Amino acid sequence: MGFYENLAAQSAPITVAPESTSYFSESNPGLDPRLFRSEQLIGTVRQDILGLLFNHLKAHYYNPEAYTHAWLAGSGVSFQWAAQRDPADLDCLVGIDYNSFRRANSQYVGFSDQEIADTINDDLRTELWPQTSHYLGVFELTFYVNVASDIRQIKPYAAYSLTDDDWVVEPQIMSAPTNKKWEQLVDRDLAQGTGIVDRYTKALTAIEASKNDAARLNAQSALKLAVQQGAALFDAIHSGRSLAFSKNGLGYEDYANYRWQSGKASGLIPALKTMKEISTKSRQEFESQTYGMTLPDVKILIRRALRYNN
């Protein structure tokens, strides 16, 4: 099966439909009772999440307890936890003492802090995330290593230390910023993204209705372009949001976070994320059929070379 055939096979109807988000929801008077008793994390939840994380890390790295700190962070541990989303978001952020990591894992001596974080995140994303996509039946629990070892540097809504069983950034009553210029900009995102989804839908319909090779190839080319554009817009919005929660960003009140959250509320982000996944899966399927394996990107190859040469 060629690339275009793989792309069409991975594609399915996509809609842009509004959904509830915590960012634009009213603050609750208390924290999520599925996780907290008063303002203390339920002990069994804390131990379970730490167990999931460290069991995974021990399978790949030596002595992770010596250099790893873990927090629950974001809307899931804030007063804005009650948006009607299924599953609800729950983020476990991981800090690494990189010098201690290198001492315990000598094959990573030549790695930068960013390369170590990327390596661990690759493993977390492919191996641990699928196990925790419906944690406790209600949460999408994700694990992510930040290059910054101190979580306060990324300005989270709130952060609870799983390691120390205490708050590092206590939750506050917050509400989304109001800014007419920002509203105009996100409306432009929605118009652009909806146009991409419309072209995607038309191309998919044209492929199914095509009666000759030329018509099918034209429709497949249009589908490929729409998927590429959707994936690129998703990456642009997502990377901006990542910068919002960095040392130089403004966190909750950053425009890039507002842009991301507005896209989630309008349904644009889920639609673009689906297009990004279609792009990735069709490429991987084509590579697997052509080369017998999925080809790693250049950054992964460099990290592997560094590891094996140390």
Predicted regions and their residues:
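Extended acidic low-complexity intrinsically disordered regions
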Residues: 2-11
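Catalytic core of pol beta-like nucleotidyltransferases
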Residues: 11-87, 95-310
